UniProtKB/Swiss-Prot annotation:
Gene: aroB
Protein name (database record): 3-dehydroquinate synthase
Metal-binding is among the record's keywords: yes
Known role: Catalyzes the conversion of 3-deoxy-D-arabino-heptulosonate 7-phosphate (DAHP) to dehydroquinate (DHQ).
GO cellular component: cytoplasm
Necessary cofactors: Co(2+); Zn(2+); NAD(+)
NCBIfam families from the UniProt entry: aroB (TIGR01357)
């Protein structure tokens, strides 16, 4: 098992990364739990892992109840959030009841947002069961639900008490979901660590085969990079925006196609290539760099091109992006592979040229 600590102005908390951790969840997490816990999970994860977690909590003397939600990005909304609140109220959850998110990014984001708002703030912990949530969404305190006009538009910054990533849960992940998570892994190398990017180029087959040693190394490096950035910029006033590489284009894809049609990681993958193409247009990187990024994404089973839709739709969706400031669109581009930069775009012609092959 590897452990690292996230330090933020709010508070510090541990991330546990390894194999076979879920049966130890009670003992590992007990210092970070109240006397009572509410397990929030979904219909897909519950048959696989809920019983193991319940047994672990029983062994640690933590009483608990469970709330089982429908699965999928299409359910990341007010209606499903209210199901969490209904379950908490019906079970007389108190302010010190710890919410436990057992699932992927959707469960983690919604559980965190519920925790941030239930009785004005209840503690929560993350037990991510997908690669995407283990390397990205479970760390850093971003919580949210979607709105029909934009992804993750309603939410809060609210840090968990702990994160427990059991890599064994990835063995039940569908291949498409594994690839989607790998998009975020590749994103980290692309935005901030060229040596990690090169390591991924060398080890992608082993990672996709879930070989234990390279997998724990990759997950740890991603969490380490995110923890370092969040420690410097908890509420995304500056460099934390780098973590949104590919997300401005990616969120537009998800919104246009309908939440869940393209998985988040798939949209981010195509978005990263578009961000590289935009950086090409700005004279920052070469076409060869963009092709190299696309090749690595394709090696992970990911799309390197977006779906085709009208330029006006792209602009409409991207105008709702959370990085827009004073009406100016801000993108995360690349100075070079391994170095992200915040880029303001006032000339939409450069966006049209970037997107032209896909219009």
């Amino acid at each position: 098992m590897k452990t690292l600590t996230v330090h933020t102005p709010s508070h510090s908390y541990p991330i546990f990364i390894g194999n076979g951790l879920l049966p130890q969840a009670g003992s590992l997490l007990k210092p970070h739990l109240g006397k009572r816990a509410a397990i929030i999970t979904n219909e897909t994860v519950a048959p696989l892992y809920l019983g193991t977690l319940q047994t672990a909590l029983d062994a640690a003397g933590v009483s608990h109840f469970s709330i089982i939600l429908p699965d999928g990005e299409a359910h990341k909304n007010w209606q499903t959030l209210n199901l969490i609140f209904d379950g908490l109220m019906q079970n007389r959850a108190e302010r010190k009841t710890t919410l436990i998110a057992l699932g992927g990014g959707v469960i983690g984001d919604m559980t965190g947002f519920a925790a941030a708002t239930y009785q004005r703030g209840a503690p929560f912990v993350q037990i991510p069961t997908t690669l995407l949530s283990q390397v990205d969404s479970s760390v850093g305190g971003k919580t949210a639900i979607n709105h029909p006009l934009g992804k993750n538009m309603i939410g809060a910054f609210y840090q968990p008490q702990a994160v427990l990533a059991d890599l064994d849960t990835l063995h039940t992940l569908p291949a498409r979901e594994l690839s989607a998570g790998m998009a975020e892994v590749i994103k980290y190398g692309t935005l901030g660590d060229i040596s990690f990017f090169e390591w991924l180029e060398q080890h992608m087959p082993e990672l996709m085969a879930l070989e234990r040693a390279p997998l724990i190394q990759a997950v740890y490096r991603c969490c380490q990079m995110k923890a370092d950035i969040v420690a410097q910029d908890e509420t995304e006033q500056g460099i934390r925006a780098w973590l949104n590489l590919g997300h401005t284009f990616g969120h537009a894809i998800e919104t246009e196609m309908g939440y869940g049609t393209w998985l988040h990681g798939e949209a981010v993958a195509a978005g990263c290539v578009l961000a590289a193409r935009l950086s090409e247009q700005l004279g920052k990187i070469s076409a060869a760099d963009t092709a190299r990024l696309a090749a690595l994404l394709e090696a992970a089973g990911l799309p390197s091109a977006p779906p085709v839709f009208a330029f006006e739709k792209w602009l409409e969706h991207m105008s709702h992006d959370k990085k827009v400031s004073s009406g100016v669109m801000r993108f995360i581009g690349l100075n070079r592979l391994g170095e992200a930069v915040i880029t303001e775009i006032t000339d939409t012609d450069i966006l049209r040229r970037t997107l032209q092959p896909y219009l």
